[in-house]
Amino acid sequence: VVLFMKGTKMMPQCGFSSRVAGVLNYMGVEFADVNVLADAEIRQGIKDFSDWPTIPQLYVKGEFVGGCDIITEMTLSGELDALFEAKGVTYDKDAAEKIREANAS
């Protein structure tokens, strides 16, 4: 699991990157972070590679999953859990449920 983001998982530099890193951290997912602010070539290259114009970008087992809005929707719908299970990614199911419960109202 790799998150191309602005900043790092310990110090995100934008709200969208912070939200996705926060979800992954809360769910106990081990992930690598790539700070696109550190290298303009990586920042543009990942946008070209995915044909997606914005950062952050989440990849699971080499597959582009989406940006902040998509990851938020997938978390709330349970699709992210299903993807992690299908790809053999370890995560905390109880934490995922707590996120959904907190956003159910």
Predicted regions and their residues:
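Structural micro-motif
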Residues: V1-V2, S50-K61, G66-D69
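Local sequence-structure signature of Cys/Sec-based thiol-disulfide redox active-site neighborhoods
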Residues: V1-E30
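Non-catalytic, surface beta->alpha helical segment in thiol-disulfide oxidoreductase systems
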Residues: V60-A95
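Thiol-based oxidoreductase modules, predominantly thioredoxin-like and allied folds used
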Residues: N25-G45, F49, P53
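Alpha-helical interaction elements in eukaryotic regulators
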Residues: F16, A38, I42, D51, ...
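Short amphipathic alpha-helices and their capping/turn residues within compact interaction modules
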Residues: V1, N25, V29, D51, ...
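Eukaryotic short linear interaction motifs
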Residues: M10-Q13, I42-R43, E73, D92
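Mature, matrix/stroma-exposed regions of nuclear-encoded mitochondrial and chloroplast proteins
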Residues: Y91-S105
